[in-house]
Amino acid sequence: MKNSKVIKLQDRVPKLKNQKKRNKPPVNHRLILYISILFLLVLFLIYFRSPLSNIKKISVFGNHYMTDEQVMEKSGITYKTSYFRVTARQAEENLKKQIEIKSVDVKKRFPNKIDIHIEEYVTIGYINKNGKLQPLLENGKTLDILPSGKLPVAAPIFEPFKEEKMKELISELEKLTPTILRSISEIRYTPTTSNESHLTLYMNEGYEVSTTIQDFAKRMEAYPLILKQIEPGRKALIDLEVATYFKYLDDEKKK
């Protein structure tokens, strides 16, 4: 027994600890990662298919002739549409089919908002059709008759006339400055024996203008300058057909 080796308890404890560590199963970090990703995918699919992913707000800008509801309908986007199913390009193509829309930009705002920015063709006038007004656009298209008294955009009113002359006039109206265009209240096609393109304009300032379709926009450039020469409160006829001048109508009445 003298040669027997005595092992102290404190010497054996570290060996037992190391043995326990070796027996402990390793943590599978990759498996945990896969499970986490799978869990997130399941959550996403549930959200994607649930009403929670539906559009909550649709904002429309720049529309005059179409209501917000009509824009939404034509775009194909509703409050029942999932945000993730909205394709901005497809919505834009749908809206560009409308004759009044010149350009459109659809933006998605995560998580559930849509912005629709519209640019309409400029309204250059209203055609008086049996007492009802039809907007005439710069692209030459006319819209449906407006409800009585509703004028979304300030523009002149005129009676329909020859299509050929109408196209010429539209081309000239596009060249007018917005200020001059807003000054025109009514345009009448009044051909004469010497000028089949003669026009009579009734201005919002109360004056009458005699002019012609040829170079109409260029002739109208003189209108603001002539206004400065007319005495306030007096009625005048402004002639822009050949020369550029005006005459007071109340002087003729006195004679």
Curated annotation (Swiss-Prot):
Gene field: divIB
Principal location class: membrane
Protein name: Cell division protein DivIB
Cytoplasmic side: 1-30
InterPro entries in the record: Cell_div_FtsQ/DivIB_C, DivIB, FtsQ_DivIB, POTRA, POTRA_FtsQ_type
Entry GO CC: cell division site; plasma membrane
Domain POTRA: 53-121
Function noted in UniProt: Cell division protein that may be involved in stabilizing or promoting the assembly of the division complex.
Pfam families: FtsQ_DivIB_C, POTRA_1
HAMAP family per UniProt: DivIB (MF_00912)
PROSITE patterns the UniProt entry points to: POTRA
Segments on the Extracellular side according to the record's topology features: 52-255
Compartments where found: Cell membrane
Transmembrane segments: 31-51
GO BP terms, alphabetized: FtsZ-dependent cytokinesis
